Curated annotation (Swiss-Prot), chain B:
GO terms for cellular component: ATP-binding cassette (ABC) transporter complex, substrate-binding subunit-containing. It comes from Ruegeria pomeroyi (strain ATCC 700808 / DSM 15171 / DSS-3) (Silicibacter pomeroyi). InterPro entries: AAA+_ATPase (IPR003593), ABC_transporter-like_ATP-bd (IPR003439), ABC_transporter-like_CS (IPR017871), ABC_transpr_MalK-like (IPR015855), ABC_transpr_MalK/UgpC-like (IPR047641), Mo/tungstate-bd_C_term_dom (IPR008995), NA-bd_OB-fold (IPR012340), OB_MalK-like (IPR040582). It catalyses: sn-glycerol 3-phosphate(out) + ATP + H2O = sn-glycerol 3-phosphate(in) + ADP + phosphate + H(+). Residues 4-234 form the ABC transporter domain. Keywords: ATP-binding, Cell inner membrane, Cell membrane, Membrane, Nucleotide-binding, Sugar transport, Translocase, Transport. SMART domains: AAA. This is sn-glycerol-3-phosphate import ATP-binding protein UgpC. The lineage of its organism: Bacteria, Pseudomonadati, Pseudomonadota, Alphaproteobacteria, Rhodobacterales. Gene3D superfamilies: 2.40.50.100, Nucleic acid-binding proteins, P-loop containing nucleotide triphosphate hydrolases. One of its GO terms (biological process) is carbohydrate transport. The keyword NAD does not apply. It is a peripheral membrane protein. Part of the ABC transporter complex UgpBAEC involved in sn-glycerol-3-phosphate (G3P) import. Responsible for energy coupling to the transport system.
């Protein structure tokens, strides 16, 4: 952790860490502790008096059907995005791995969605699926499906799932391709000599050997789906119709900034905080336990 | 019958030809070593036999079948890779059983074969371990075990001992040879180490720059090298090459010394003399000005120059010998130890 | 490897091309939409092939007065804001993380581990988890509607620090010993030796952080009420809302295109560095 050869203590190291520590304290630790504190309060409608109510806000949340629905919805959303995005990336990376020359070209063409902001991704997809003008509703109409995600909750959820997954394919693709390319070629050749065909080789060898990457991406994708997708929801459905796409992170924003329920929103923030911490711990645990060759 | 026929093989990458008309006939049960410096094409040749590289022109036959178009899995071969290529996520037992499992051999038969191979290779205690828990030598044996259980027609070895330390290498070398003799499977073994080649092969194929320099038994290559390349490659320390002229059965060196010999060669030649074929002799024709002597215990290597010239020479003398720097020592070549080569083509001149 | 199944190669390329089509489709449609005039864009279905109005739309978007029905600054101004924010975040993060990692790795001082864990904690606090209180702090400090407010709260996260820490840990000890013999003090060592050795990592990280900064959405949304300070990524949402009343999809899509171009360009141009940085940061 510390280099064997190092400098002794003085004023200098304190000065060096000061900027980061300062900003961390002011903009991270303090607000986080404020959120925790506020989650124990209830303010009245005018913000004039506050009351310390211990865990009442949390109890209210747990009993709130809407909150629980939002929680369940978020889990569903996460799972769908992870499966769709990782599955597509796995298939694409598997094929790209077979291309001897040109793998880099395919990679270049695949990675640009990474650079697109989630909210823009949302905007693009909502444009493609615009009930009056969009190309997809037009095509769906020809097979008898009436598309209007402004009215249909399931369709709205489907739309945001696709937009979120589309954006993440690039990231997952990069990691899967890198993992596959780090498998020694001679291993695959040995399997071929042993008689394994392409599909068999993938199932018996390639997939098991990239399992650390799969674990890693699961956590990353979960965190992405929980938090980075705010922009997509905000741009595409604003949580609607009828709250059918209100995921947890959107609810925090909505209840807090729009609904001005500070205590409830703070409590939601705290719960989200606990979730992130849990996911981060899992991530670091798994990275320590990398499969060795 | 698992003989192997290499018929006029050419390998090219785009416009660059890396193997030029390689040909040879390998008999059933032979242990053939393909040897040469890095980049000479030996691994490429092996991989072509395995089916891991395409053939640009020519044919490869295993037994009676032409195998050019066949997938590696269909050629009935087994290969031991330089880095062993063991499946890291499978146990030793599973590694060895994998190829058999795919060919849908019965579980009993698989178990029997795996146990048999494990006995031969002394891998019994390790059957349930994973590769990362094994030492280099053990992993090597697992790689061989994987090849043995398949009962293939041909074994292919791609520099399997390069990753082992020197002592282990010598030990494993012997084991591979004994194993092959016991099993009697036709084998092709690739290495850049000429000592390995000499000790392992029934016959050696020396490759240089994609060309076959010579294909024969180790002793043939040692006694009658076909080119200066083979002459300099086989035998350590390497053969001395001296510019000379030949006429009427004798050879005259650049410094005027004359060596009697037989033969009809004449004109400028390159004379090859092995360091171990020069005997100390007061009146001998080959006079060397000493630079330094390396003491190896069993023999001594004398480094110097041919007197009166700049040509470097090495002489190997038995036992402990020493000589002062700048002293001149005289030697006589032993009988039949003169090798004459054409100075331009490098090819052996018939005597 | 010899695989006498050419059909498999065909399938491989087909699948990959299909993948690229799916990935590129939204962007293609956006591009096409940006090249037609407003009237064409109100007729269903929207066109799939480019039109001829690219430059017209381009100039109108860039220099026009913003879309009717929105409260956004002119697009060129928003691009500038985005650029300023992205650069400040990227450069700020790199600078702070470099010196922090240097201190943590190369100095033995009291509270060293405490600081390390403090920085680590920030990994678990993305902005979405602390939006309200952070907003309050920023407001109290009077940093709303400013470039500082847009960037400072986002530059202390730990990923960059961890990456540099990892890089520094792999630099051989002999470097420092030899520098000391040469008479270099800590800051000299840092500037003359450590930073040049970390160049590729800094470049890779810059790509990732620039994109991160440029694409910020929730935070700028909250703290800018002044139209002059809107960023281009923020404005997309407002334009979508405006589209309800008076759809000018060609302008909206052109704006979206402009909003996408800089990060995409940076990623593609520095692809190799970016991939290397990505696969090494998140470990």
């Amino acid at each position: 952790m510390l280099k064997r050869v190092h400098f002794p203590s003085s004023l200098l190291p304190y000065l060096l860490v000061a900027p980061q520590i300062l900003i961390t304290l002011v903009f991270f630790i303090w607000p986080a502790s404020q959120a925790v504190y506020q989650s124990f309060l209830i303010e009245d409608a005018f913000g004039l008096s506050t009351e310390f109510v211990w865990f009442e806000n949390f109890e209210l949340l747990i009993e709130d059907a809407q909150y629980l629905q939002s929680f369940g919805r978020t889990i569903l959303f996460s799972a769908a995005v992870a499966v769709l995005s990782m599955g597509s990336a796995l298939i694409l990376a598997g094929f790209a791995d077979r291309v001897v020359r040109g793998a880099t070209t395919y990679r270049t063409l695949m990675i640009w969605p990474y650079a697109v902001a989630p909210v823009l991704a949302g905007a693009l997809w909502v444009f493609m699926f615009n009930p009056t003008l969009g190309i997809f509703p037009f095509l769906l109409d020809m097979v008898g499906i009436d598309w209007n995600h402004y009215l249909n909750g399931t369709q709205a959820m489907t739309l945001v799932i696709f937009a979120a997954a589309w954006k993440q394919i690039a990231y997952n693709f990069l990691f899967y391709l890198a993992a596959m390319q780090s498998i020694p070629r001679s291993l695959i050749e040995a399997a071929a000599i042993d008689g394994a065909g392409p599909v068999r080789r993938f199932v018996d060898h390639i997939f098991p050997l990239i399992s650390p990457t799969t674990f890693f991406l699961l956590v990353i994708n979960a965190v992405y789906a929980f938090f980075d997708t705010f922009g997509i929801i905000h741009a595409v459905t604003q949580g609607g119709p009828a709250n059918s796409t209100t995921i947890l992170v959107y609810k925090v924003y909505n209840d807090g900034f729009v609904g001005l329920d500070l205590g409830g929103s703070a409590a939601q923030s705290v719960i989200l905080m606990i979730l992130v911490i849990a996911m981060t711990v899992v991530q670091f645990r798994f990275i320590e336990r990398k499969v060795e060759y | 019958m698992a003989s192997i026929t290499l018929d006029n093989l050419v390998k090219a990458y785009g416009d660059t030809e890396v193997l030029h008309h390689v040909a040879g006939q390998i008999e059933d049960g032979e242990f053939i070593v393909i040897v040469g410096p890095s980049g000479c094409g030996k691994s490429t040749l092996l991989r072509m036999v395995a089916g891991l590289e395409t053939v640009t022109a020519g044919q490869i036959s295993i037994g009676d079948r032409v195998v050019n178009q066949l997938e590696p899995a269909d050629r009935d071969i087994a290969m031991v890779f330089q880095n062993y290529a063991l499946y890291p996520h499978m146990s030793v037992r599973e590694n060895m059983a994998y190829g058999l499992k795919i060919r849908k051999i019965s579980k009993d038969e698989i178990a029997r074969r795996v146990e048999e191979a494990a006995d031969i290779l002394e891998l019994r205690p390790y059957l349930d371990r994973k590769p990362r828990q094994l030492s280099g030598g053990q992993r090597q044996r697992v790689a061989m075990g994987r090849a043995i259980v398949r009962n293939p027609q041909v074994f292919l070895f791609d520099e399997p001992l390069s990753n082992l330390d020197a002592k282990l290498r010598v030990q494993m070398r012997l084991e591979i040879r004994k194993l092959q003799q016991r099993l009697g499977v036709t084998s092709i073994y690739v290495t850049h180490d000429q000592v390995e080649a000499m000790t392992l092969g029934d016959r050696l194929m020396v490759l240089n720059g994609g060309y076959v320099e010579q294909f024969g038994t180790p002793i043939e290559l040692y006694d009658r090298p076909a080119t200066t390349f083979v002459a300099g490659f086989i035998g350590s320390p390497a053969m001395n090459f001296l510019p000379a002229t030949a006429a009427e059965g004798s050879v005259t060196l650049a410094n005027g010394a004359r060596i009697a010999g037989s033969g009809t060669a004449h004109g400028t030649v390159t004379l090859g003399l092995r360091p171990e074929h020069l005997l100390p002799d007061e009146g001998g024709p080959v006079r060397v000005r000493v630079e330094l002597v390396e003491q190896l215990g069993a023999n001594s290597l004398l480094h110097g120059q041919l007197e009166g010239t700049d040509t470097e020479m090495v002489v190997s003398m038995p036992g402990h010998m020493s000589a002062a720097a700048d002293a001149v020592m005289a030697f006589t070549p032993t009988a039949d130890s003169l090798h004459l080569f054409d100075p331009e083509t490098g090819k052996r001149i018939a005597e | 490897m010899v695989e006498n199944r050419p059909i498999l190669n065909v399938i491989t390329h087909l699948v990959l091309i299909l993948g690229i089509v799916i990935v590129a489709l939204p962007i293609w449609i956006t591009f096409v939409a940006a090249t037609h005039d407003a009237v064409r864009m109100t007729q269903a279905p929207i066109p799939m092939l480019p039109g001829t109005h690219f430059w017209e739309n381009f100039t109108q978007t860039l220099f026009g007065s913003g879309l009717s029905g929105t409260e956004t600054a002119p697009v060129w101004r928003m691009l500038l804001n985005s650029l300023a924010m992205a650069m400040m975040i990227a450069l700020g993060k790199i600078a702070i993380s470099l010196i922090s990692a240097f201190a943590i790795v190369y100095f033995k001082f009291p509270f060293r581990m405490f600081f390390f864990w403090l920085i680590f904690v920030t990994l678990m606090l993305p902005v979405e988890v602390r939006i309200l209180p952070t907003f309050e702090v920023v407001a109290d400090l009077g940093m709303l509607n400013s470039y500082w407010g847009l960037s400072i709260p986002l530059i202390a996260s730990a990923t960059a620090t961890f990456m540099f820490r990892q890089v520094f840990l792999t630099i051989p000890d002999e470097m420092l010993e030899s520098a000391r013999i040469d008479g270099a003090g800590p800051l000299r060592f840092f500037w003359d030796i450590l930073i040049p050795l970390s160049r590729t990592n800094i470049a890779a990280l810059f790509v990732i952080l620039f994109i991160y900064g440029w694409n910020q959405y929730l935070w700028p949304l909250l703290i800018t009420t002044d139209t002059d300070m809107t960023t281009i990524v923020m404005s997309i949402k407002q334009m979508l809302e405006a589209a309800e009343q008076s759809p000018q999809w060609n302008i909206i899509m052109m704006t979206a295109l402009l909003a996408m171009l800089p990060p995409v360009f940076v990623v593609v141009a520095m692809q190799k560095l970016f991939v290397q940085g990505l696969t090494e940061t998140d470990k």
